[in-house]
Amino acid sequence: MIDLMMIVYATILSAISSLVYIVIGILPGTDETATMAPIALALLLAGVDPLLVLSWFIAAIIAFKITDAIPVALAGIPGGVMAVPQVPDALTAREKGYADTLLRKGNSAALIASILTLVFTLAVAWLLLPVGDWLNTKDQVLGVSIPRWFWILFAGVIILALTSKNKLLALITIPLFALMIQGLRGVYGKNVVVSFFLGITIGPIMYEVFQSLNKDLRRSIARRGFKEVKLAKIDRIYLNPFKNINREELANILIWSPITSILATVMSPVGLTILIGDLLRESKKDKLEGAMLAYTTREGIKLGTYIGGTLIPLLVIGAPTGPMSAGPAGPFFQDIQGIGGKPFQYILSHYSYLDISLILIYSALVSLLITYPLIVKYSREITRYVFRRISAESLYGLFIAIALVLAYYDAGLPGIFGMLLVAVISGALARQGVSLGVLFMTLVGAPTIVALLKAVGGV
């Protein structure tokens, strides 16, 4: 039951989350999983109500995904990883002198998609709730008891592996990584999850850190002074989003944001963003017109995939079946001792679906009321301040420190070394073109994958 204090806490957490992720979103090259998952997990382990943490998380998605496109539009530099596909279209617009128009359209698309996809996803999840019990029913396959949702996860990890840059290595990694995880659990003597999850999360960062310890490799790292970044000038941007986009752009946002929010249940948000954007760009003969349409629609898709990829697995399936739910939203599927189970189970058992929907919509509105006006009025000033005063490396140092503390909490000193082992291997695989989503989803399905391998091998 939601009371007045719950609303107050949701307001405070959503506001803080929005302000924090406005800054993180603008920082160049920030990774969504590395910056969102550790904080959500820390809040859950600290005993914060899981529904309030989910409110924090939804507000973070909105603030992060709106702001990570700002440095793209103004400087041609991506904020988060999801903003990377936007760079070519942004550069096309900058060359033609339309950087301010691009920023205006992107902000408007993000606002519309945030509200649309959240309401749409909650409605679809409610309709699919009866399917949840069926998906959690277990069947006997080769003598192994397997929940039906596992096959959704398995299909998702195969699809993700096939869309990775290094397809063959990604496919081979699935059984190998599952065996490593189960082997480490055997050493620990318990079902450790959190430290492994954190290891994958910080993998690319830790790989870079350890690589820099090698004298020969360190010499190959380019050293430069301060980088000069020129921000495009922007004119007035209307607060009314419908004044900033045309009918065709609005139609594509209304069509593709909901569709991709469903597809993100098992598919990669980055892959969907690239695919749909490229198709729309190629549909236009005029290069600038195609870039504008692709950029605007992608801003909507970014929000759609992150919201849908989180809520449908959480509310309906009860398992992380896609890169989003297994990655940034992964903490909601981990066993948390303080609440006696998994956060998503706590949310569904302690609150009605109406209460959950209302608090999430409220948190989204709080985030939009803070983020959208700030970005519309002060995007250039905020970007300049963040670029000058805040170091991305210092934030990554903070997230690594959080990960080390949580790994110790999870499994003591062995948990830290296990996390570092998983981190180095994950980082190396990511460097070779394997999507981290493959590793996150393999982590979830590792017990079943290994059990099936043993059954097939007659062990």
Regions of interest found by a model, annotated:
Residues 1-49, 130-142, 194-290, 402-404:
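Helix-loop-helix hairpins and the membrane-proximal interhelical loops
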Residues 17-32, 63-76, 158-164, 257-268, ...:
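Transmembrane alpha-helix interface/packing and boundary motifs in multi-pass membrane proteins
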